[in-house]
Amino acid sequence: MGQKMNPLGFRLGITQNHRSHWFAQQKNYSEDLREDEKISNCIVNYIRRHMRSSSNHGGIARVEIRRKIDLIQVEIHIGFPNLLIENRGRGSEQLRTDVRNMLNPVDGKLNIAIVKVAKPYGEPNILAEFIALQLEDRVSLGRTVKRAIELAEQADIKGIQIQIAGRLDGNEIARVEWAREGRVPLQTIRAKIDHCYYPAQTIYGVLGIKIWIFGDEK
């Protein structure tokens, strides 16, 4: 039986970087790690709740966190930052307030920076969110996957692989559908493979979306 390994962890330190950048004493490590997860979840949930609609999606590629003694610096890499900074920046200010209220008062200063992703649909998280939004709006599976591959190809990628599992198009029996375009060398460590999993909440149940994107090779 084949054993599957997460392609991000497999390449960590080679073509993939850590999302959290800090050092902590052993007694504080677990608390800081949980706090990082809370920060990321708070940001993602805020974007989905306030910025996502039938015509657009949040477009978060990743959240990176750096800690110093009296400073927590958060970088939100987002494909469509205009959705967050419109209305004179009220969206970003409200987000900062929500994150600040969730943190420990002794953590010090909080700084949130918004970084625009140059090619949004070259990021698997953004592309998976697009697919989920289309499937939740009852767009056919074939049309959705075809459009997603077209958007990814516009980002100058070398290959993409998509897996969608569940009750596709409302069928009674769950199944798995695959789509692949170009090269996706999962066994090559020097190949820069980005990967994500994203659930889509449809009226027929939850669909699981997995995407692998091959960007370049070192």
UniProtKB/Swiss-Prot annotation:
Disulfide bond sites: none
InterPro entries: KH_dom-like_a/b (IPR015946), KH_dom_type_2 (IPR004044), KH_sf_prok-type (IPR009019), Ribosomal_S3_C_sf (IPR036419), Ribosomal_uS3_bac-typ (IPR005704), Ribosomal_uS3_C (IPR001351), Ribosomal_uS3_CS (IPR018280)
Heme recorded as keyword: no
Gene Ontology MF terms in the entry: rRNA binding; structural constituent of ribosome
GO biological process, one term: translation
Residues covered by the KH type-2 domain: 47-118
Xref: Pfam families: Ribosomal_S3_C
Keywords annotated in UniProt: Chloroplast, Plastid, Ribonucleoprotein, Ribosomal protein, RNA-binding, rRNA-binding
Cellular component per GO, a single term: cytosolic small ribosomal subunit
NCBIfam families referenced in this protein's UniProt entry, alphabetically: rpsC_bact
Similarity field: Belongs to the universal ribosomal protein uS3 family.
Name of protein: Small ribosomal subunit protein uS3c
Name of the encoding gene: rps3
